UniProtKB/Swiss-Prot annotation:
Species of origin: Cochlearia officinalis
KW Oxidoreductase (keyword) present: yes
Residues noted as binding NADP(+) in the record, renumbered to the chain: 22-46
SS bond partners: none
Positions annotated to bind substrate: S155
Protein name (Swiss-Prot/TrEMBL): Tropinone reductase
Length: 273
């Protein structure tokens, strides 16, 4: 009997059964993979996106798979829409939320001297301000759940230079520090906060870059694993950080990049043995 109880406890450490989650930007790419990963582990998930048509297409696929997913349209760069989103989530989940994944984000690639004030404001509001404000709004719901977890989807561009734009890298670097601050401030409320930094991942956002075969080959050559990552290789880490099994992991910035961020210069022709 004791063994059965221990086995049951072990299984619950690796399950999200009965938990609730909000994932922003969940209709494609990493966000879509995160929605599916959390739902497969038993969570009830609400997700949002700007494109209603794409959101409904994804919803039909999730329903066909038997996932417990609901959706709403939201542009996270809008403060009013963020507040409306959290009201929806609070109503759906009876004022309690276990998981918040701040995934929605965007990138404008330009030389620094070509950025406009509008570019700066848009990137800041979409990437950083939305993560900050949604975390603020979600705090009472996460606290009420008794077991809360926030994951901020940052970028490898937050920890090393990647020439995709200085403002983008700055927003993501600030997200990492936000995660550290909230992890310490909200630990007493039983809320964990971590940031995940994807490297080059095969997503709709990156597809425009990878159409350039020369660029793609250059990227693959600098990644130790020799390939671009897949969205589900990011979502698996996100899901782990939300599990009871990861209860002691908080305030961390974790790269999912095939070793890109730690790679120096590899001498291809130099024999190592």
């Amino acid at each position: 009997m004791a063994n059965l109880r221990e086995s049951s406890r072990d299984k619950s450490r690796w399950s999200l059964e009965g938990m609730t989650a909000l994932v922003t930007g969940g209709s494609k790419g990493i966000g879509e993979a995160v929605v599916e990963e959390l739902a497969m582990l038993g969570a009830r998930v609400h997700t949002c996106a700007r494109d209603e048509t794409q959101l409904q297409e994804s919803l039909r696929e999730w329903q066909a798979k038997g996932f417990q997913v609901t959706t709403s349209v939201c542009d996270v760069s809008s403060r009013d829409q963020r507040e409306k989103l959290m009201e929806t989530v609070s109503s759906l989940f009876q004022g309690k939320l276990n998981i918040l994944v701040n995934n929605a984000g965007t990138c404008i690639t330009k030389p620094t001297i070509d950025y406009t004030s509008e570019d700066f404001s848009f990137l800041m509001s979409t990437n950083l301000e939305s993560s900050f404000h949604l975390s603020q709004l979600a705090h009472p719901l996460l606290k009420s759940s008794g077991l809360g977890s926030i994951v901020l989807i940052s970028s490898v561009a937050s920890v090393v230079h990647v020439n995709v734009g200085s403002i983008y890298g700055a927003t993501k670097g600030a997200m990492n520090q936000l995660a550290r601050n909230l992890a310490c401030e909200w630990a007493s409320d039983s809320i964990k906060v971590n940031s995940v930094c994807p490297g080059f991942i095969s997503t709709p956002l990156a597809s425009n870059y990878f159409r350039n075969e020369e660029f793609k080959k250059e990227v693959e050559n600098i990644i130790p694993t020799g390939r671009v990552g897949e969205a589900n290789e990011v979502s698996s880490l996100v899901a782990y950080l939300c599990l009871p099994a990861a209860s002691y992991v908080t305030g961390q910035t974790i790269c999912v990049d095939g070793g890109f961020s730690v790679n120096g210069f590899t001498f291809k022709s130099l024999p190592l043995r």
